[in-house]
């Protein structure tokens, strides 16, 4: 159980988080883990730097408004992970489901196999991650001047509907100190990430335009652990 919060210039945010986890040895080379968590935040939950465009009937920008999110959010999640190993091969498979009272629902599946190479000082670890999310009930990429400003609205893409794929590969080498058999690890990881948004309904003048293009990124990470 953990509490958090901040207060600044008349605005405040408070939260409480609870986590319950169980780890079970299923077999000699198989471990399972189950976590259930609930968190609740209330107060100022807006992003003060996020604004939304207001479009008129032809699709031209008529103005801007700051976002306004509900002042309470409750999230519930379930996480299940299985790890198994056979000789020089091991793998981890996990699934996570989250839902909240903003109608955001997400599912994550991640698979990480690992092959230990010669002398057990080197290994390679591919990775695959799939993610899917629905949008918050107040998410709107833009507003219509004809409809007026709703009570709650946000154009933050992180609250929109999208799915994402991540592919990765890690190579690691253990540097063993022979006198005491302790070692450090040098690793290199490369990942490719692609995020695709669900395209919303748009005014006739904006149809055919890719207003929410896919997000693509390549991450290269070099690590040293000792």
Set out the residue ranges of the language-model regions.
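Outer-membrane beta-barrel translocator domains and adjoining extracellular loop/strand segments
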Residues: 1-8, 45-53, 95, 104-109, ...
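Outer-membrane beta-barrel translocator/channel fold
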Residues: 1-25, 29, 42, 123-174, ...
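Transmembrane beta-strands of outer-membrane beta-barrel pores
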Residues: 14, 38-44, 74-76, 84-88, ...
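Short loop/turn motifs that connect adjacent beta-strands in outer-membrane beta-barrel proteins
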Residues: 25-31, 85-88, 118-121, 175-185
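Transmembrane beta-strands of outer-membrane beta-barrel proteins
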Residues: 32-36, 89-93, 107, 111, ...
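Surface-exposed loop/turn segments flanking beta-strands in extracellular/periplasmic regions
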Residues: 52-62, 145-153, 209-211
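Solvent-exposed loop/turn segments connecting transmembrane beta-strands
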Residues: 70-73, 98-107, 118, 214-217
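Outer-membrane beta-barrel "beta-signal"
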Residues: 169-171, 213-226
């Amino acid at each position: 159980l953990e509490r958090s919060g901040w207060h600044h210039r008349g605005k405040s945010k408070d939260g409480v988080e609870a986590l319950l986890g169980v780890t079970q040895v299923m077999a000699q080379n198989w471990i399972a883990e189950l976590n259930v968590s609930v968190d609740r935040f209330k107060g100022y939950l807006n992003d003060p730097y996020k604004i939304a465009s207001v479009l008129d009937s032809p699709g031209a920008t008529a103005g801007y408004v700051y976002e306004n999110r509900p002042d309470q959010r409750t999230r519930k999640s379930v996480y299940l992970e299985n790890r198994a190993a056979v000789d020089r091969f091991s793998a981890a498979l996990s699934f996570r489901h989250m839902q909240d009272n903003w109608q955001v629902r997400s599912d994550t599946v991640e698979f990480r196999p690992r092959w230990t190479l010669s002398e057990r000082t080197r290994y390679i670890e591919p990775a695959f991650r799939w993610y899917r999310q629905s949008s918050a009930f107040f998410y709107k990429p833009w507003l219509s001047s004809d409809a007026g400003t709703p009570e709650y609205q946000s154009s933050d893409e992180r609250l929109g509907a999208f799915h994402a794929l991540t592919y990765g590969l890690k190579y690691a080498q253990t540097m063993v100190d022979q006198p005491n058999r302790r070692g450090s690890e040098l690793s290199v990881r490369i990942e490719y990430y692609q995020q695709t948004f669900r395209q919303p309904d748009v005014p006739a003048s904006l149809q055919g335009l890719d207003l929410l293009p896919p997000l693509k990124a390549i991450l290269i990470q070099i690590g040293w652990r000792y």
